[in-house]
Amino acid sequence: MTPADLADLLRSTATTVLDERGLDTSALPAVVTVERPRNPEHGDYATNVALQVAKKVGVAPRDLAGWLVEALVSHAAIAGAEIAGPGFVNLRIAADAQGTIVANILKAGETYGNSDAQGTHTINLEFVSANPTGPIHIGGTRWAAVGDALGRLLARQGAKVTREYYFNDHGAQIDRFVRSLIASAEGKEAPEDGYAGDYIADIAKQVITQRPEALTLTEPERSEVFREIGVDLMFTHIKESLHEFGTDFDVFTHEDSMHTSGRVQEAIAQLRKTGNIYEKDGASWLRSSNFGDDKDRVVIKSDGNPAYIAGDIAYYLDKRERGFDLCIYMLGADHHGYIARLKAVAAALGYDADSVEVLIGQMVNLVRDGQPVRMSKRAGTVITLDDLVDAIGVDAARYALIRSSVDTSIDIDLELWASASSENPVYYVQYAHARLCALARNAADLGLQHSTEHLELLTHEKEGALIRGLGEFGRILQNAAALREPHRVARYLEDIAGDYHRFYDSCRVLPQGDETPGDLHAARLALCLATRQVIANGLDILGVSAPERM
């Protein structure tokens, strides 16, 4: 019996209890809250439904709780129920009912934890979207990990998800990139507002290799050659780095295409028709303050060139016309102002502002020997994705970046995350999986097969704690998806790994010496295999490997 199953049982029981007494059943919440008590002595689960409903139906909370207890104790799945405090109900689940969690996990396999909770959404998930002017920095790397995990999570909860990278290849930063390449090719210092680092020199050399005559060309042809080849080489490197990091995209959209295809002009024309564009001081303004923004925004500057938001308007409209009902943007810490701005764009175009969600990620700091790591040899200035992977590996990098809420800054201790230690969270979780795989191999060598026939034998408190933890997986995934917080999955896996290690230390799974394998061994092996499956499913959501040996 999972928490969701118990919540359904509590609601149906409460409905019957109220109905039998002529009380209003509509006072019940759509979903009854079920929680695991902090103190295991208080039971397996607790609910506050009596406290929620009693006042609405005109009875004392403890009276309603008492009626619920009377009805629940007769149910086969309930081993015990009692009133606590002002009207809480503490519950103990029967071992055989609890054991169905194990059987269900083994039956569902890789799909365990999946649901259709997000099935109504067709989601465009845009993340990373780094400028093609240098390698992906550590902030973008955080989004590469979190965005990919969120996409996997939402897909497991039934959403149709398209992972998209918006390629910012339009604007002044590209001009600075091109001037930096040309300066490097000529053996000069980078422009004061340009880019430096080994990667600039490498790309400049490759441009000359492909077009030996490039430096002899006159402008604007020379800049166009460096732009075309240089941007392509940089973007190729970015995509390769992301792929090696385990993050792939379904769609790459070029910002420049919004302008060259006429999409920007079309979007602005649509806003003019609805009266949401006006003219002032020679510029065209969006009435964004009418839709929750703190001020109106210039969309066409007085010199006739589109402002940056013009591309955002066209891009959002493009997404909607491609069939997405929800557009999630994952942006850096300096983009808080974009939340109201993008929602205003949606509303001005006639869509629900809630069709835009903006997640803001905070800073990432790297630490080695207690000191901050600030410089990258490759990039010349900032730490990059490749730097982090070189230091601690893909799995540790992804896990370290995912396991904390994105709205908090994180410090990554490179020594800790590279260590084979239980203090290293990813090692701790992966070791639990590898240990389970080793146990399964040893069981096979002994001829022991798992069985779900006698799961009622799993009555040890450590077995119960592990089973109840496994039963939370579906609810964890649903909440994590709804809140757009994949870090909840990582923290859950650490809890499950802890539950498993404590179970293993207290409950012998394999027969010893001449001991004949029995039903309890087979049931415990089934519990171990179910635990292995849940850990593997969770690591898959995070894009982290589940090693069979360590």
UniProtKB/Swiss-Prot annotation:
SMART domains: Arg_tRNA_synt_N (SM01016), DALR_1 (SM00836)
UniProt motif ('HIGH' region) ranges: 130-140
Enzyme superclass (EC): ligase
BP GO terms, sorted: arginyl-tRNA aminoacylation
Main location: cytoplasm
InterPro entries recorded: aa-tRNA-synth_I_CS, Arg-tRNA-ligase, Arg-tRNA-synth_N, Arg-tRNA-synth_N_sf, ArgRS_core, DALR_anticod-bd, Rossmann-like_a/b/a_fold, tRNAsynth_Ia_anticodon-bd
Catalytic activity: tRNA(Arg) + L-arginine + ATP = L-arginyl-tRNA(Arg) + AMP + diphosphate
Subcellular localization: Cytoplasm
The protein's Enzyme Commission number: 6.1.1.19
Any one GO molecular function term: ATP binding
Alphabetically ordered keywords of this record: Aminoacyl-tRNA synthetase, ATP-binding, Cytoplasm, Ligase, Nucleotide-binding, Protein biosynthesis
Taxonomy, superkingdom: Bacteria
Pfam families referenced in this protein's UniProt entry, alphabetically: Arg_tRNA_synt_N (PF03485), DALR_1 (PF05746), tRNA-synt_1d (PF00750)
One cellular component (GO) term of this entry: cytoplasm
SUPFAM superfamilies recorded: Anticodon-binding domain of a subclass of class I aminoacyl-tRNA synthetases, Arginyl-tRNA synthetase (ArgRS), N-terminal 'additional' domain, Nucleotidylyl transferase
Gene3D superfamilies found in the cross-reference section: Arginyl tRNA synthetase N-terminal domain, HUPs, Isoleucyl-tRNA Synthetase, Domain 1
Family in the record: Belongs to the class-I aminoacyl-tRNA synthetase family.
NCBIfam families per the UniProt record, alphabetical: argS
PANTHER family according to UniProt: ARGININE--TRNA LIGASE, CYTOPLASMIC, ARGINYL-TRNA SYNTHETASE
Complexes and interactors: Monomer.
Stated name of the protein: Arginine--tRNA ligase
